Amino acid sequence: MTGKRELRVKPIVNGTVIDHITSGQSLNVLKILGINAASRYVVSVLMNVPSGEMKGKDVVKIENRELDPEELDSIALIAPRATINIIRNYEVVGKHRVDPPREVSGLVRCGNPNCISNTNEPVTSRFTVERTGDDIQLRCSYCEYVIDQEIADHLL
């Protein structure tokens, strides 16, 4: 298939395409965005797609929805190489890479069972985001607990 492109999913008219998601993380991206079976958006998910620059990647297409910057940057917690494409009338009108936020609140559960954010107190979890290259770690603002692996397992 030299020189040919394979079309796996039809193009979208308007919406957002999240490309170069770390392989196996597309469902966690949907979780971060609050998209589930009850959502009204048409969503296409491609998993383990061959890619020249990555061993494999996932792709998410969300029709008729443009994501806000906070949502996009939260994706960087689990997919630091993701690229966001804004589509209007079948054309890419905006494209950028995600950039992790400096802090996340209410998105991740602290791994320390004794943390105040895991008790019956009305406290929202809050983490400082620390990045070294593609490696992301989260430090709890209350107890200093560090999550440096399997961040997706700690998503609320």
UniProtKB/Swiss-Prot annotation:
SUPFAM superfamilies membership: Aspartate carbamoyltransferase, Regulatory-chain, C-terminal domain, Aspartate carbamoyltransferase, Regulatory-chain, N-terminal domain
GO biological process: 'de novo' pyrimidine nucleobase biosynthetic process; pyrimidine nucleotide biosynthetic process
Free-text remark on how the cofactor is bound: Binds 1 zinc ion per subunit.
Cellular component aspect of the GO annotation: aspartate carbamoyltransferase complex
Names of the cofactor(s): Zn(2+)
Reported function: Involved in allosteric regulation of aspartate carbamoyltransferase.
Annotated residues for binding of Zn(2+): C110, C115, C140, C143
InterPro entries xref list: Asp_carbamoyltransf_reg_N, Asp_carbamoylTrfase_reg, Asp_carbamoyltrfase_reg_C, Asp_carbatrfase_reg_C_sf, Asp_carbatrfase_reg_N_sf
Entries under PANTHER family matching the protein: ASPARTATE CARBAMOYLTRANSFERASE REGULATORY CHAIN
Keyword Plastid: no
Protein name: Aspartate carbamoyltransferase regulatory chain
Similarity comment text for this entry: Belongs to the PyrI family.
HAMAP family according to UniProt: Asp_carb_tr_reg
Keywords: Metal-binding, Pyrimidine biosynthesis, Zinc
GO-annotated molecular function: metal ion binding
Subunit-structure text: Contains catalytic and regulatory chains.
